[in-house]
UniProtKB/Swiss-Prot annotation:
PANTHER family: RIBONUCLEASE H2 SUBUNIT A, RIBONUCLEASE HII
Gene3D superfamilies (UniProt xref): Ribonuclease H-like superfamily/Ribonuclease H
Family, per entry: Belongs to the RNase HII family.
E.C. number: 3.1.26.4
Source organism (scientific name): Rhizobium etli (strain ATCC 51251 / DSM 11541 / JCM 21823 / NBRC 15573 / CFN 42)
Primary subcellular site in the record, as a coarse category: cytoplasm
Its job: Endonuclease that specifically degrades the RNA of RNA-DNA hybrids.
The name this protein goes by in its record: Ribonuclease HII
Chain spans, region Disordered: 209-229
Length: 229
């Protein structure tokens, strides 16, 4: 007889579509931790621009409908949910520039941005749920790293949307300063258009020089100068 795979096996877990919910937050609350924040980042893979992190504490009575991993949503739907999240939740955003990424590495820069976002929440979190494998060091509260967290926790999903929309807006603003690379179209990812721009014009000050295939860049404005008001 063929052996059946347990229902909680990693194989089935990876193949069954997940819908984020509030169960992890309620579990933390039952353990005495409240409020609970979700945290996520956007922009680990691009060749240019910052990595942006967001931390979100949702109001259980005002959770926007349709929260999901930002990558599963259209740009229009992300924008709609972004507005709703800002109107109903406690939100904090932080970023690490391309310079910071080059000085350390993308993992450390991402975790540092996430730490600063969490620590800057107007309402201090009692517990944090983070997407991925790591909880940022240096927090004032305990936390839990959740693999595929943006597909499991609505708080992490909300943070993923805030981080993604914020970063996309920053890169659209960057396009106005550096129009030769098409940042508004690809947000700094290594598309054919972007690589062609680098080949023709060389890198600018927003490029991550520690990422292949980049070389020494030019002077120019830092990403903080491009954050939309």
């Amino acid at each position: 007889m063929k052996r059946r795979t347990p229902p909680d096996s990693p194989l089935l877990f990876d193949t069954v579509p997940l819908v984020p919910d509030f169960k992890l937050e309620l579990k933390a609350r039952k353990a005495g931790h409240w409020p609970v924040a979700g945290a996520d980042e956007a922009g680990r893979g691009p060749l240019a621009g910052p990595v942006v992190a967001a931390a979100v504490i949702l109001d259980p009575k005002r959770i926007p409908e349709g929260l999901n991993d930002s990558k599963q949503l259209s740009a229009q739907r992300r924008e709609e949910l972004f507005v709703q999240i800002l109107a109903t939740a406690t939100v904090s955003i932080a970023s690490s520039s391309s310079t910071r990424i080059d000085e350390t590495d993308i993992r450390k820069a991402s975790l540092d941005a996430m730490r600063r976002a969490i620590c800057s929440l107007a309402i201090p979190a009692s517990y944090v749920l983070t997407d991925g494998l790591d909880v940022p060091p240096g927090l004032d509260c305990p936390g839990q790293a959740v693999v595929k967290g943006d597909a499991r926790s609505v708080s992490i999903a909300a943070a993923s949307i805030v981080a993604k929309v914020t970063r996309d807006r920053m890169m659209a603003r960057a396009h106005n300063v550096f129009p030769d690379y098409g940042f508004a179209a690809h947000a700094g990812y290594g598309t054919a258009q972007h690589r062609a721009g680098i080949e023709k014009h060389g890198p600018c000050s927003l490029h991550r020089m520690s990422f292949r295939p980049l070389r020494k860049g030019e002077d120019g404005p830092e990403m903080d100068e491009l954050i939309p008001e």
